[in-house]
A protein has these predicted regions:
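Alpha-helical transmembrane segments
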Residues: 192-200
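Folded, non-transmembrane soluble domains that reside on the lumenal/extracytoplasmic side of membranes
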Residues: 20-184, 199
Length: 200
C-alpha cells in the first residue's frame, strides 16, 4: 500500500513538472500585436485578470502621453534560455517601440528562474538607465515577488516605471548618490544582478 502511494505521488509530481510549459519567442502569444490595447502577455494566468487590466491601463496611458511602447510578459519557464536574451528577442521580434525612435521596453517575469528583466530600446536608455531599472526592481518589485505575490510586484513595478517615464515620480533622480551603501550591499549580497535584470 505504501509503495502504491509513493508511486502515485511520484507520478503526480512528474505530471506537474511536465505540465509546466516552456515558452520560446516562437510559441509565446503575441498579445500586443493582436490587440494594441493589451500590453500584458500572461498565457498561464500567473497574474490575475485584475492585475493585467491595471497594467494595461497604465501602459496605454503611458503610450498616449509619451509615445513609449511597453509590453509585459509573464511566464512560468523559458527552459534553459537566458532572461536577458529572451527579452531582447521579444523586443526585436515583436517590434516594441516606435519606428525610428527605438523607444520600446520589455518587462519579463520568469517565475521558475526567479528573474525579473527590463530590456530597453536604445532610444529609451537615457530615460530608463540600468541603475534606475535595478532600483525599481529592488525597491518596488522584489519585496513582493520573493513572497510569490506576482500581482503586487508587477503592478508596483509598472507603476514606478510609468512614474519615471511620464515625469510624475516624486523625488526621482538619476543620481546614484541616493542609493545608500546598505542598499547596494543588500543588492550585491541578496540578489543576482544582470544588465537590467535581477533574480531573487
Amino acid at each position: 500500500m505504501k509503495r502504491l502511494i509513493s508511486i502515485s505521488l511520484f507520478l503526480c509530481l512528474l505530471l506537474s513538472v511536465q505540465a509546466q510549459k516552456v515558452y520560446t519567442t516562437d510559441n509565446i502569444p503575441k498579445v500586443h500585436l493582436q490587440n494594441k490595447m493589451r500590453y500584458v502577455c500572461n498565457p498561464d494566468g500567473i497574474l490575475s485578470q485584475a492585475a493585467c487590466d491595471s497594467i494595461d491601463r497604465m501602459l496605454y496611458a503611458l503610450e498616449q502621453q509619451t509615445g513609449i511602447e511597453t509590453v509585459v510578459a509573464v511566464v512560468p519557464s523559458i527552459g534553459n534560455d537566458d532572461c536577458f536574451d529572451f527579452a531582447h528577442r521579444l523586443l526585436n521580434e515583436w517590434g516594441v517601440g516606435k519606428k525610428g525612435k527605438n523607444n520600446g521596453l520589455v518587462i519579463l517575469l520568469v517565475t521558475d528562474q526567479r528573474c525579473i528583466q527590463f530590456y530597453t530600446g536604445y532610444g529609451l536608455e537615457g530615460d530608463l538607465p540600468d541603475a534606475i531599472c535595478k532600483r525599481i526592481q529592488t525597491r518596488n518589485m522584489i519585496p513582493y515577488l520573493k513572497d510569490g505575490n506576482w500581482d503586487a510586484g508587477m503592478v508596483a513595478g509598472v507603476r514606478a516605471v510609468c512614474g519615471r517615464l511620464d515625469g510624475s515620480m516624486v523625488n526621482d533622480t538619476d543620481d546614484e548618490e541616493d542609493i545608500s551603501f546598505f542598499g547596494i550591499l543588500a543588492a550585491v549580497i541578496g540578489f543576482f544582478v544582470v544588465a537590467g535584470g535581477i533574480g531573487w
